[in-house]
């Protein structure tokens, strides 16, 4: 089932320097909660400055949903330490609140009033809050409080030059974009390995079912927790963060212009369903527009092609201008075993897997083939640890044991690991391969199995509160390592100044400004 990558691996072993200079970045979301696990109702902590303009700490959907962002980094340890500093400083500056250590929230009732993230009075800030109002009215606020980790990854120019010859200008844009689309297609085919290893949401609180009947064979504990015994990541299931109305958009990942055209079409396509919500009610705007996507970011995807945008530029226009610059992997649950929600083992695994995805052959995929890849993902998400589980290839009927496919993949990853270790020194990548490949013979080693044992004992709430408390105490005590207190103070002041400048510069009334941007 795994494509034959032997030639590409042999090529890589002859050109190990092509992997020198991999760049990455991390984003981690987490809910601020009270000691009893309920959602914090306070505003964004003052010490963290302006969520609109802060370089490292912002908010996602809700005012209580923090998001930490590391700068682009070539050094894994430095990046993780930077992320830990952001957590340390925040833990010391949020009073008695703490960070929820799980992807799935617990003590939130459906219909509970969840305050949307607030960004001040500038048109840009108000637009961001209105977008969130639209998300709430379309999908419900509960779904939007699910949190995850995003891993951003780019291969060095040396890799593309070794692979594609001496490229520059428009030629480089085309070839590098084609290379990243290959990564994305392979990710759709084989990325289910991520929830298999690292999925950490095998259970949900009853509020997530919202009283609706479900065909899933949930088991229920006395404290009202629902779980599937072999599930890995319900966050990635239809109960979690997904969007059914987008499934027939037909966006494909074969060609830059085709992809962008599909995305641009979706933000212009009216939706009958969302038209029913209305645009305005009693003088209050309910969504930016009633199209399938209000803006491009609403497209739900487990992986995204990205380029850093210039001021006022849409994500798709940035891609058209310069091609794909990096990839954003969006399928990681919060790692409950790390105080910062992600660890070195995961980052090293993703490095290996991304390189493998760039090497393995990846035939073009139609939108129907893309839909077929969802079958494997769903199997792994809902019953990934089930003994004897099999997976298919695309829309074909042949089935292969997950256990064997996983081991075959790791045989390749081990060779990538040897190459990366040869240029970085040490055996860190090979060690990660040895640790993780054991999860196929022993699914009890996976994150989902480990966290489920705790959840069955003490419930999602009990587990979340215990981890949150332990991490709060740990992070508050740890000294900063890279950033200093004064760096945070300076960034707080600079971010508040930037927000103020934006608000002062806006002379156009929001309603007028919105007409141009909706």
UniProtKB/Swiss-Prot annotation:
The gene is gshA. GO terms for cellular component: cytosol. Its EC number is 6.3.2.2. Belongs to the glutamate--cysteine ligase type 1 family. Type 1 subfamily. It is an enzyme of class 6 (ligase). Pfam families: Glu_cys_ligase (PF04262). The keyword tRNA-binding does not apply. It comes from the Bacteria. Pathway: Sulfur metabolism; glutathione biosynthesis; glutathione from L-cysteine and L-glutamate: step 1/2. Disulfide bonds: none annotated. The lineage of its organism: Bacteria, Pseudomonadati, Pseudomonadota, Gammaproteobacteria, Enterobacterales. Keywords: ATP-binding, Glutathione biosynthesis, Ligase, Nucleotide-binding. GO terms for molecular function: ATP binding; glutamate-cysteine ligase activity; metal ion binding. This is Glutamate--cysteine ligase.
């Amino acid at each position: 089932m795994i494509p034959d990558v032997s030639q590409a691996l042999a090529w890589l072993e002859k050109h190990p320097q092509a992997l020198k200079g991999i760049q990455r970045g991390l984003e981690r979301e987490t809910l601020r909660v009270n000691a009893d696990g309920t959602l914090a109702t306070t505003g964004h902590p003052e010490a963290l400055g302006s969520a609109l303009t802060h370089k490292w700490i912002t908010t996602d959907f809700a005012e209580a949903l923090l998001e930490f962002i590391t700068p682009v980094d070539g050094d894994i340890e430095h990046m993780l330490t930077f992320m830990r500093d952001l957590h340390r400083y925040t833990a010391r500056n949020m009073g008695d609140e703490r960070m929820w250590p799980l992807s799935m929230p617990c003590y939130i009732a459906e219909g509970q009033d969840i305050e949307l993230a607030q960004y001040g009075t500038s048109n840009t800030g108000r637009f961001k809050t209105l977008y969130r109002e639209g998300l709430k009215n379309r999908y419900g606020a509960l779904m939007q409080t699910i949190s995850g980790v995003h891993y951003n990854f780019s291969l060095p120019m040396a890799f593309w030059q070794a692979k594609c010859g001496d490229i520059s200008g428009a030629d480089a844009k085309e070839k590098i974009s084609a290379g990243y689309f290959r990564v994305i297609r392979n990710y759709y085919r084989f990325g289910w390995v991520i929830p298999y290893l690292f999925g950490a949401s095998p259970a949900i609180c009853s509020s997530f079912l919202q009283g609706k009947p479900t065909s899933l064979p949930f088991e229920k504990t006395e404290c009202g927790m629902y779980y599937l015994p072999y599930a890995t990541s319900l966050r990635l299931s239809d109960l979690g963060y997904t969007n059914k109305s987008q499934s027939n958009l037909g966006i494909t990942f074969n060609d830059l212009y085709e992809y962008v055209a599909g995305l641009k079409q979706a933000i212009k396509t009216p939706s009958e369903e969302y038209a029913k919500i209305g645009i305005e009610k009693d003088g209050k705007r309910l969504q930016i527009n009633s199209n399938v996507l209000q803006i491009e970011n609403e497209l739900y995807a487990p992986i995204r092609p990205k380029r850093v945008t210039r001021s006022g530029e849409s994500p798709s226009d940035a891609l058209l201008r310069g091609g794909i610059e990096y990839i954003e992997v969006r399928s990681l649950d919060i790692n409950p075993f790390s105080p910062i929600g992600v660890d070195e083992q995961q980052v090293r695994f993703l490095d290996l897997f991304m390189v493998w995805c760039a090497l393995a052959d990846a035939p073009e995929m139609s939108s129907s083939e893309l839909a077929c890849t969802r079958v494997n993902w769903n199997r792994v998400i809902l019953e990934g640890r089930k003994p004897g589980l099999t997976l298919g290839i695309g829309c074909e009927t042949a089935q292969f044991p997950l256990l064997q496919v996983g081991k075959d993949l790791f045989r390749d990853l081990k060779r990538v690991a040897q190459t990366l270790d040869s240029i970085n020194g040490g055996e860190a990548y090979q060690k990660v391969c040895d640790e993780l490949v054991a999860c196929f013979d022993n699914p009890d080693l996976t994150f989902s199995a480990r966290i489920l044992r705790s959840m069955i004992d003490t419930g999602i709430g009990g587990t979340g509160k215990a981890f949150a408390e332990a991490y709060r105490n740990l992070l508050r005590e740890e000294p900063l390592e890279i950033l200093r207190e004064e760096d945070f103070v300076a960034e707080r002041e600079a971010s508040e100044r930037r927000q103020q400048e934006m608000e002062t510069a806006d002379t156009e009334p929001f309603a007028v400004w919105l007409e141009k941007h909706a």
